[in-house]
From Swiss-Prot:
It is found in: Membrane. The gene is mam1. This is Mating factor M secretion protein mam1. One of its GO terms (biological process) is conjugation with cellular fusion. Pfam families: ABC_membrane (PF00664), ABC_tran (PF00005). It comes from Schizosaccharomyces pombe (strain 972 / ATCC 24843) (Fission yeast).
Length: 1336
């Protein structure tokens, strides 16, 4: 039975359309809203006939419609300037709601109350200086002066108590607001990204890069609220309060002093306009660096095997270099802005001194008023100076919030159309689904390259339907459209006569289940993986699906049975497929789609699983994409798709009548037919099988736990008395174990810990040592310290100058010395501004050199680690990229901001105290006496910050990892309809992070409040002591004013140090983790060995036993394995899933160390690893194609000319596919090679292996994703190879190709011999290769 689909289009190769003209039939167009036929007519005209169908969009329009967020293309930043320029400060409040107004209002009230203490302090300080001035001019007595100073000291003590309350409140509330914004941002981004269509992600260069960028922006946004917004709001409130007091005492003097402040505002605004583009470029290049690192670490075995560590390192280094250049540009502008602003902030006292002197001379103000105005304006200057370092972080927060808003509000027309059209809430499943002239082109590919062309087919419900066709023919595209991952470019799909786009998403999700060819196993227990979102399933249902999918065969051998934690790397491919199948069978939806569901299973398991599916799914719709024709019964419906066309729809028995298909796809049947002629098979065997064959008319659920399958009797069973052996007994006999049983006690929402609880962030001493070790950095760092020393010295010098200026007002003639000291104000202001610029920029250069050195060193060391290191859960690729990319800004801050600030503050304090000692040692001694208390509390504060910050970073990594896994595996997760499960896990992780953030906010706010209030108490003590020292004539008034000014500035710098502690703690943690990675010792395997010799290819295993490093105790993946493979021999390694086959490969490629393995008689441990790997090639079952283009991926690790490349493509039959691509070999390779089918990826990996000209070729299920025709062609290539070939396979055709077969089971070599020798009922191989069947 044929379905006509315009078979007169043989020139359409791989669905590449050469458009002539098109003229649709009017009646057809009028009857259906979207019904086109693509023929040899103009595609241009066809595209002009756009249908009003809401779900159809021109291919060329989708990219702009879907991706209006910035992207990196060929190292060029697209739309960066434009995007950065349109951001506004309203974006900053995007994540706050109307209901947050009371909280925000309360936070601002507390901020104002906390800020009011500073002008009150200034007011009391003015009162103290006024009392000193009146006493110096004999206006009051000594007792009156002491009384006034003591009273004001008491006021300051009260202010200190109030500061403890207000500081705690304001600090806690700002961090609380930050936590709210971060929680909402993560929740919203998860919802938005998980709701995006597959079309959106097909146009996204990297899912991992996007997730990293989102995480980075959320961190910047959170940070900008918790610290910069807090600093800015508080200092603005302080400035406003001080201005009010200043205006209250002398409005004219205040206006004169502040006359140059508008210039500061203009300078800051002008320079900020250039900061945006620098930040955006830094963000985009960091995103690219994170993608490169994640991809490399995820495919680390491929990278190491091809000796491409240096190349991947250079790719990462180039991206980091771009990021660093943007960072330096940002730092230069920020330093220039800060230097100019600092000059104007200090120079205001130039005109203030002249005018104040004039007012004092004319008796319009008194000394106390002048001191109050100067003190208030100085507080304003100091507050604005503290705002300057916060501006860069605030700007990053602004543009990060704009990115989040842009991402969350980006219009996805595909999803919008689906939501608007989704009206159908129920389906009866009475008819079936229908494709009506459906054509489709992926939006990420060339518009003329259609994957499906004019597909029209009807499939009734309740059928088992097989979809077959060559690799890349459009089978998976067919399924993607049915799952509504994409919408048809032209045509319509109907489900039960309802347009697919009108069916509610939840209804569709509860109707269809997808099992992918490469199943996704999540970090949870086996039971949780299977029951996912089916918590109400009974235990009997769970056990039944485990039995049907044969999960119990390996799960019941574990101590914890189904509750054994697992991760993807711990399971063989077949075991992963069985878990995925059990998960799908438990859901038991009306429609089940299986994409090569048994490609990684051995023949016995494959047949048993397929038979179980047939029985369990009887009466329900099951679509199976397969290349294995032996799995299709004669009466089952088959759809044949080739080059985007539906070629045939018929029963299997009709299909095999065609010569092409008979020759191409029936090799497995031929193998089985040959078994009938084998003299070792008893003639009554088939009748015996039929006798116990299951009756499909009976309910499959009635199968008992003791169901059996045929022909698996013990090897010792007598040939004359064949018996049927219980499958449970076989499980008990075999005690099947996984090849890599390295299960971790973990869950999806687990928290990552790079440090254990006993480890701490590295000390500042260790950090300084790491700085000094970088020779290139030393001079920059020393120069930065020198300029910081100058800047730090400028503050006490300025304090000294101000004290001299204040002393002028206590003279009989205040005008004496005004010209000199006002000029000194300008000199000090200019020096301070210049030193600020040079110090900040030089330290930024130092930070760039330091961070780049250690993170590049860390990456270089990572590429030398053994596989056992990467198997550890804390070395997950996302964690490593977050440490080495996302958190690098915190490490930069260690030098560019924090060391600079701390050193400046330290310099100021030392100079201030030394100067105070020189001027009057007694008061300085009081300050020194209380400094241990300040140091102790600061130390405790720092410890609290480090511990709470590490806890918060761990939960953030955990939350981000869930987002990362969800987005990377989004199609699979949607296929299982378990997105709600991951949303719930994400919510649970957010709850944990929320609790962690609240704990951090409480304890750090308490520590900050205590430290801040101590400064008030110390100042009160200094004032109290000053009155006593003056009364005892230890000081003159002039000396006391100078010492108090210096001491006050010293306390101000101590306050600056305390304010920087949060950033210091975060930076110490980030720095510690980078330094820890950079200090790792290289692995032993990659550089091991020294022998080089003319490799022939003979392999020997001599009693090899091996257990994976993290496996259960006493569990051996290989147990006393002895085997020999001759040079140029083709040997097939066969066995059930988990028997140890892949472990042999791991040891041969020196992934793990092992003794007693020999190549050409030389011990493997003594052979030079890099030299050996160049002589070996491997084609994995799930190959990784690395490189930016197809050509780069083929030449990955080798240097060959184009002729060799084309020859390799010819041998793997990929030439035609490549030639039909718009850019040929220069076609970009998308993330996860998603622009190729699984079979095409395997063939490209095979071509890459051939280009290495190997002496030893290892094929690990290299044809599992190939159709039978492609597989047969590759087998011819393999047959003609002259090197040693090691074939791991479950395919009988590949086994027949081998000169010899080695059969493994449970890590033991059972037997070896040729195919014909092993095909008798006495052998383990016969049981393995023979069709297993369920019986009662």
């Amino acid at each position: 039975m044929h379905i006509h689909s315009d078979l007169s289009l043989p020139q359409f190769e791989h669905a590449s359309i050469d458009p002539p003209s098109y003229s649709p039939q009017k009646s057809s167009f009028e009857e259906k809203k979207h019904n086109f036929s693509i023929t040899n007519k103009s595609l241009e005209t066809l595209r002009s006939q756009e249908s009003p169908c809401s779900t159809t969009f021109p291919v060329s329009d989708r990219k702009d419609a879907l991706l209006n967020i910035p992207t990196v293309v060929d190292d060029e930043f697209q739309h960066t300037e434009e995007l950065a320029g349109v951001s506004s400060w309203s974006d900053f409040f995007y994540l706050f709601h109307f209901s947050d107004i009371p909280l925000i209002f309360g936070t601002l009230i507390f901020t104002c109350l906390s800020a009011a203490l500073e002008p009150l302090m200034t007011w009391t300080t003015g009162k103290v200086f006024d009392a000193l001035s009146q006493y110096a001019t004999s206006q009051i007595t000594l007792g009156k002066m002491i009384s006034l100073i003591n009273f004001n000291s008491l006021l300051i003590t009260i202010f200190g108590l109030a500061s403890c309350v207000f500081s705690f409140g304001v600090r806690f509330l700002w961090q609380y607001l930050s936590a709210i914004a971060g929680k909402r941002a993560r929740s919203l981004c998860f919802h938005v990204l998980s709701s995006k269509s597959s079309t959106f992600y097909s146009l996204t260069e990297s899912k991992s890069g996007l997730v990293n960028s989102v995480d980075r922006c959320i961190q910047f946004y959170e940070k900008s609220i918790s610290l910069p917004m807090f600093h800015i709001a508080e200092n603005l409130a302080i400035s406003l309060s001080c201005l009010i007091i200043s205006f209250r005492y002398s409005w004219s003097l205040t206006l004169v002093v502040l006359a140059s402040y508008p210039i500061i505002i203009l300078v800051v605004g002008f320079i900020n306009s250039f900061l945006s583009s620098a930040y955006e470029k830094d963000r985009k290049s960091s995103e690219k660096a994170a993608s490169i690192l994640e991809k490399s670490i995820s495919a680390i075995q491929t990278v190491i095997f091809h000796s491409m560590q240096d190349t991947e390192y250079r790719y990462f280094a180039d991206a980091c270099s771009t990021s660093s250049k943007s960072f330096l540009r940002f730092s230069f502008l920020d330093a220039f802005q800060g230097g100019v602003s600092q000059f104007f902030l200090y120079s205001v006292f130039f005109q203030g001194l002249w005018f104040g002197n004039h007012l004092a001379t004319t008796k319009r103000v008194n000394v106390g008023q002048v001191v109050t105005v100067f003190g208030s304006c100085l507080s304003v200057a100091s507050s604005l100076q503290q705002i300057l370092p916060a501006i860069p972080d605030l700007i990053k927060g602004k543009f990060s919030s704009h990115f989040i808003k842009t991402l969350c509000e980006s219009h996805d027309p595909i999803e919008a159309a689906k939501r608007s059209a989704a009206k159908i809430k129920s389906i009866s499943f009475e008819r079936g689904f229908r494709f009506d002239n459906v054509s489709f082109a992926y939006p990420s590919r060339d518009e003329n390259l259609f994957s499906l062309i004019n597909v029209s087919v009807f499939i009734p419900f309740g059928e088992l339907v097989h979809i077959i066709g060559p690799s890349g023919s459009g089978k998976s595209t067919f399924i993607s459209l049915l799952l509504r991952y994409f919408s048809p470019t032209y045509g319509n799909i109907y489900l039960d006569d309802f347009p697919l786009e009108e069916i509610d998403e939840h209804v569709l999700g509860s109707t269809i289940t997808l099992v992918c060819q490469q199943p996704v196993i999540f970090d949870m227990t086996i039971r949780e993986n299977i029951i996912m979102r089916n918590e109400n399933a009974s235990e009997s249902d769970f056990e039944e699906v485990c039995r049907l999918a044969l999960v119990d065969e390996f799960a019941l051998t574990f101590d914890q049975s189904y509750d054994t934690p697992c991760k993807e790397a711990s399971l063989s491919g077949g075991q992963q497929q069985r878990i995925a199948l059990a998960r799908a069978l438990l859901r038991d939806t009306e429609i089940l789609i299986l994409d090569e569901p048994t490609s990684a299973l051995d023949p016995i398991t494959k047949n048993l699983v397929m038979d179980a599916i047939r029985a369990h799914r009887k009466g329900k719709t099951t679509l199976v994409i397969t290349h294995d024709m032996s799995q299709i019964n004669n009466d089952e419906l088959v759809l044949v798709i080739d080059k985007g066309h539906l070629i045939q729809r018929c029963a299997r028995k009709e299909l095999v009548l065609f010569e092409d298909f008979e020759n191409n796809v029936s090799i497995d049947e031929k193998v089985l037919k040959e078994e009938a002629d084998n003299p070792f098979i008893l003639p009554n065997e088939e009748s015996l099988l039929e006798k116990y064959w299951i009756n499909y008319n009976e309910s499959f659920s009635q199968l008992s736990r003791e169901s059996l399958f045929t022909s698996l009797e013990s090897p010792f069973t007598d040939i004359e008395s064949p018996t049927i052996v219980s499958r449970r007994k076989i499980v008990e006999q075999r005690k099947l174990r996984m090849e890599k049983e390295s299960f971790q006690e973990t869950n999806v929402d687990q928290t990552f810990h790079l440090f254990d609880d006993k480890e701490h962030a590295c000390s500042l001493t260790l950090i300084f040592k790491s700085i000094w070790k970088v020779k290139k950095l030393r001079w920059f760092f020393l120069l930065g310290l020198l300029t910081s020393l100058i800047q730090g010295a400028s503050v006490p010098i300025f304090a000294y100058v101000i004290s001299k200026c204040l002393n002028l007002f206590m003279q009989i003639d205040p005008s004496i010395g005004v010209a000199f000291w006002s000029s000194m104000v300008l000199v000090v202001a200019a020096g301070s501004g210049a030193s600020y610029f040079f110090s900040h920029y030089i330290f930024s250069i130092s930070a760039k050199i330091w961070c780049d050195h250690y993170r590049l060193l860390a990456v270089k060391v990572l590429f030398t680690q053994d596989q056992a290191w990467f198997d550890q859960i804390e070395n997950y690729p996302l964690v490593l990229s977050k440490i080495l990319v996302n958190n690098i800004s915190d490490m930069r801050n260690m030098i560019s901001s924090l060391i600079e600030e701390v050193f400046i503050a330290f310099t100021m304090a030392i100079i201030g105290i030394a100067w105070s000692f020189a001027t009057g040692w007694r008061l300085a001694a009081v300050l020194v006496a209380v400094s241990p208390i300040l140091c102790l509390t600061s130390r405790m504060f720092s410890y609290i910050y480090v511990s709470t910050e590490r806890m918060c970073q761990d939960v953030v990594i955990s939350t981000t990892s869930i987002l990362h896994k969800t987005i990377v595996n989004l199609d699979t997760i949607k296929g299982y309809s378990v997105l709600s499960f991951f949303r719930e896990n994400h919510k649970n992780s957010l709850r944990k992070s929320w609790e962690a953030f609240k704990r951090r906010a409480f304890w750090t706010s308490l520590g900050f409040a205590i430290n801040n209030s101590l400064l008030y108490f110390v100042r009160a003590l200094l004032f109290y002591c000053s009155s006593i020292f003056i009364s005892k004539e230890f000081y003159t008034v002039e000396q006391m004013v100078q010492v108090l000014s210096l001491a006050t500035f010293t306390l101000l710098m101590a306050s600056t140090c305390i304010m920087s502690l949060p950033n210091v703690s975060a930076s110490r943690i980030a720095t510690s983790r980078v330094l820890k990675l950079s200090s790792l010792k290289p692995g032993n395997l990659h550089k091991s060995g020294y022998l080089k010799f003319p490799l022939v290819g003979k392999i020997e295993f001599d009693g090899v036993s091996f257990a994976y490093p993290d496996s259960e105790r006493n569990h051996l993946a290989l147990n006393n394995v002895s085997l020999s493979i001759e040079a140029r021999e083709k040997v097939a390694i066969v066995g059930i899933s988990g028997s140890g086959k892949s472990t042999l490969v791991e040891l041969l490629r020196k992934t793990y160390p092992s003794e007693d393995i020999y190549i050409d008689g030389y011990p493997l441990t003594n052979i030079d690893t890099n030299w050996l790997l160049k002589k070996v090639a491997i084609v994995d079952q799930k190959p990784h194609l690395l490189g930016s283009t197809i050509l780069e991926s083929l030449l990955y690790g080798v240097d060959r000319d184009i002729n060799s490349v084309m020859d390799a493509l010819d041998k793997t039959y990929m030439t035609e596919v490549i030639q039909n691509l718009p850019n040929g070999l220069d076609t970009p390779l998308l993330e996860f090679s998603k622009n190729f089918s699984g079979g095409q990826i395997q063939r490209l990996a095979f071509a890459r292996a051939l280009l290495r000209n190997p002496r030893l070729l290892i094929l690990d299920e290299c044809t599992s994703a190939l159709d039978s025709k492609s597989s047969l062609l590759l087998e011819k290539t393999i047959q003609n190879l002259s090197c040693t070939v090691l074939i791991i396979t479950h395919q009988p055709s590949l086994m027949k190709l081998a000169d010899r077969i080695i059969v493994m089971d449970s890590g033991i070599v059972k037997e070896s011999g040729s195919f014909d020798e092993l095909m008798n009922r006495h052998t383990h191989f016969w049981k393995l290769i023979h069709r297993g069947e369920w019986i009662e």
